[in-house]
């Protein structure tokens, strides 16, 4: 894999990660967030994109198969993202 290929893949992984996080169902544990069912609900309630994504990924439901699968997808994409960033930062690609 060349650095250009890794960079292109990292951009694709970042987009997939954003899409996966946007779709995560969440549990609201504060008064302001109790009405939020999805990431997009948090944004509509005035949360910043960054804080809403972070909050949604740490509070997603994992009781059902679909929700657990969505959480696993996010975790997998984050691992791939971290690997690509590491390889690029340390110039380990040919």
Identify the function of each model-found stretch:
Residues 1-15:
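Short, charge-rich amphipathic alpha-helices with coiled-coil/heptad character
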Residues 11, 56-59, 88:
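Intrinsic disorder/low-complexity signature
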Residues 15, 36-40, 44, 61, ...:
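Generic surface-pattern signal
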Residues 21-24, 28, 65-94:
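Long amphipathic alpha-helical coiled-coil segments
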Residues 24-54:
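Extended alpha-helical coiled-coil "stalk/arm" regions
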Residues 44-73:
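Short, glycine/alanine-rich amphipathic alpha-helical segment
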